[in-house]
């Protein structure tokens, strides 16, 4: 498969945020703080969301609120909606006048909403089915490249310019 040039240097590691969706036991708080330190040091945050989870939007809010509490700087973020293969919705009958709920929103409508909200800094994938994995790699590559070029404008070691012709 194709890899990211220089990805070993740029994407140091990922932090698992599932632990703070619900209240943390006291003994985990200290180890969790070190995970949060990694967030403070990161140049780019990649938030992976399980889109098949019934309360995924609530989980996104908890993560975003926690991120803003621990780090006041605005960091670039890519939202990765995973498990599109397991996403389900309940279509409503045309004559059904009850208000729509989250269960009535299809994947295309969800994509449009989140692409708008995230200014296209999100992607919908299925890691299991390998759907959009190459697009995810390309998106990560572009974002890391933008950060690198901003930080090191005269150093194209990681991202050398090639003619596309």
Where are these regions (language model features)?
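Loop/turn-to-beta-strand initiation segments
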Residues: 12, 43-44, 75-78
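Short, conserved glycine- and acidic-residue-centered signature motifs
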Residues: 3, 28, 56
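C-terminal-of-GTPase-core extension/linker across diverse P-loop GTPases
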Residues: 54-165
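Switch II (G3) loop of P-loop NTPases
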Residues: 12-31
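Generic enzyme active-site microenvironment
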Residues: 14, 48, 80
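Inter-motif core of Ras-like GTPase G domains
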Residues: 29-53, 66-69
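Single conserved hydrophobic/aromatic residue that forms the stacking wall/gate
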Residues: 1-11
């Amino acid at each position: 498969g194709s890899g990211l040039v220089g990805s070993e240097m740029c994407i140091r590691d990922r932090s698992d945020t599932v632990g703070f969706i619900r209240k943390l036991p006291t003994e985990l708080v200290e180890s969790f703080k070190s995970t949060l330190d990694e967030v403070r040091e990161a140049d780019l945050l990649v938030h992976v969301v399980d889109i098949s989870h019934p309360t995924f939007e609530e989980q996104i809010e908890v993560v975003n609120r926690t991120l803003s509490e621990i780090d006041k700087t605005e960091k670039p973020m890519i939202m990765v909606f995973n498990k599109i293969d397991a996403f389900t919705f309940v279509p409503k009958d045309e004559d059904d006048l009850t208000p729509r709920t989250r269960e009535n929103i299809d994947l295309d409508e969800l994509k449009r909403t989140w692409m708008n909200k995230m200014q296209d800094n999100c992607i919908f994938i299925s890691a299991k089915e390998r759907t959009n994995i190459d697009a995810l790699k390309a998106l990560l590559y572009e974002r890391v490249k933008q950060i690198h070029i901003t930080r090191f404008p005269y150093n194209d070691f990681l991202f050398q310019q090639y003619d596309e012709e």
